[in-house]
């Protein structure tokens, strides 16, 4: 499950142009503005006791499902998302020439994986082994300067720990919703990652990394365990080769220890990246290899790592 943070947050501000297609409501009852919006986006599907409710500048969705494949999905107890003047953008004649909303918030509660393998025993065992996860994020945006601050986007589980990301991003000055939807490019000035790992890394991040690492490579390997070990060696050598002006001795040691402990980095990890020349980012720049390549080449890096 990929979490491409800038894209997720900006999509709430740029996807309204594609959310105006109406579908017939059951019993000819008119759809609410939030129902029309969600129907047009086609991101969430109804689960048992599904409900949608409009709130000022936002929507609440209860008991939905996000499908990620033919045999796997994620059930969600509740989603709350709010945007500055959201109801204006959900009107019959929205003005997409306006600047993007200056603030937005999303809270996703009770996320659990649901297996749909066709084997009732396997699906049941998987369901009772799930622990709920919650996700929250908040952003502020200044259209005049193009400054976008993603504040503490956090995923949290009472069982697996938590991880949070914050970032400072620069968008085109005075960009409209329409222009951002047509050309979603930006530059990244800083990125902060916090991880309290008690299994969260292995449950969410590692499957994505394994899927990426298992792609056919120059070694000819397609086994994720082998290729993750290969990537671990490559990244370690890259960190060792970084100049002291980019990472100090203490941070270098902490980062190498974190990499060494893969795939089970049990403990507290912090990573701060700062770019003197902001790094260009776009929808085509979100692959792990590209992010790591840019970060290792251009960012000033500060790291702490404490084993639990």
Residue ranges and their predicted role:
Residues 20-308:
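Glycine-rich, small/hydroxylated-residue low-complexity segments
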């Amino acid at each position: 499950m990929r979490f491409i943070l800038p894209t997720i947050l900006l999509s709430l501000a740029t996807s309204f142009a594609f959310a105006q297609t109406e579908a017939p409501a059951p019993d000819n009852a008119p759809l609410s503005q939030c129902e029309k919006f969600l129907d047009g986006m086609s991101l969430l599907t109804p689960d048992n006791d599904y409900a949608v409710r409009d709130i000022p500048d936002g929507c609440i969705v209860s008991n939905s499902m996000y499908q990620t494949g033919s045999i796997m999905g994620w059930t969600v107890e509740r989603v709350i998302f709010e945007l500055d003047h959201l109801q204006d953008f959900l009107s019959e004649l929205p003005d997409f020439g306006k600047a993007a909303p200056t603030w937005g918030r999303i809270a996703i509660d009770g996320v659990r994986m649901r297996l749909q393998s066709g084997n009732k025993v396997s699906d049941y065992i998987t369901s009772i082994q799930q622990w709920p996860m919650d996700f929250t994020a908040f952003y502020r945006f200044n259209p005049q300067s193009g400054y976008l601050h993603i504040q503490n986007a956090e995923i949290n589980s009472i069982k697996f720990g938590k991880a949070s990301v914050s970032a400072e991003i620069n968008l085109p000055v005075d960009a409209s919703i329409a222009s951002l939807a047509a050309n979603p490019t930006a530059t990244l000035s800083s990125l902060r990652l916090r991880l309290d790992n008690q299994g969260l890394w292995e449950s969410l991040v590692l499957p994505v990394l394994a899927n990426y690492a298992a792609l056919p490579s120059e070694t000819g390997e397609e086994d994720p365990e082998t290729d993750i070990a290969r990537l671990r060696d490559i990244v370690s050598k890259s960190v060792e080769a970084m100049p002291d002006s980019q990472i100090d001795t203490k941070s270098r040691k902490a980062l190498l220890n974190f990499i060494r402990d893969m795939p089970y980095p049990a403990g507290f990890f912090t990573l701060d990246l700062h770019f003197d020349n902001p790094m260009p980012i776009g929808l085509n720049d979100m692959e792990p290899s590209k992010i790591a390549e840019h970060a290792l080449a251009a960012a000033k890096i500060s790291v702490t790592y404490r084993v639990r």
